[in-house]
């Protein structure tokens, strides 16, 4: 039995060529720049993400969509309206890497691209069991695939 978790990493500008404040940032840096921000996500367990944002920005509005959500024009209008309601000044939108990937080529999202940041995540194993897990998977594949001989020769 293995236990894993998510660690939040850096904030990355979703569209660094569109005028973001910086290509890479942190919530603390955005706080120092006196940014007003909101967040949105469409993930299975949004509480962790929203809680992470609200540790630094307790008043940040959050829009929550269902997991694997296919964003429509009406959803993007909700995001845009929430963004417009933020106080004037430096404004940012924080989302997940998954949601950024869903929206990055959506032309309806174009107006918000200079303000979008997404959070990088890292999956980690509790008690440093990553090597044990990887060996278990590699050994299984090596011994239980049609191409077991090829798998053995590559490792």
State where each predicted segment sits.
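ATP-dependent carboxylate-amine ligase
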Residues: 1-155
């Amino acid at each position: 039995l293995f236990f894993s978790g998510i660690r939040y990493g850096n904030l990355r500008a979703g569209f660094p060529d569109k005028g973001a404040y910086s290509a890479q940032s942190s919530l603390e840096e955005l706080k120092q720049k006196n940014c007003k921000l909101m967040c949105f996500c469409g993930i299975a367990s949004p509480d962790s993400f929203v809680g992470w944002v609200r540790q630094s920005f307790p008043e940040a509005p959050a829009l929550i969509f269902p997991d694997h959500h296919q964003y429509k024009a009406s959803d993007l209008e909700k995001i845009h309206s929430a963004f417009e309601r933020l106080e004037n000044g430096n404004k940012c939108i924080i989302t997940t890497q998954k949601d950024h990937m869903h929206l990055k080529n959506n032309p309806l999202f174009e107006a918000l691209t200079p303000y979008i940041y997404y959070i990088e995540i890292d999956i980690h194993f509790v008690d440093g069991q990553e090597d044990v897990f990887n060996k278990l998977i590699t050994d299984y594949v090596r011994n239980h695939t049609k191409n077991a001989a090829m798998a053995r020769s590559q490792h």
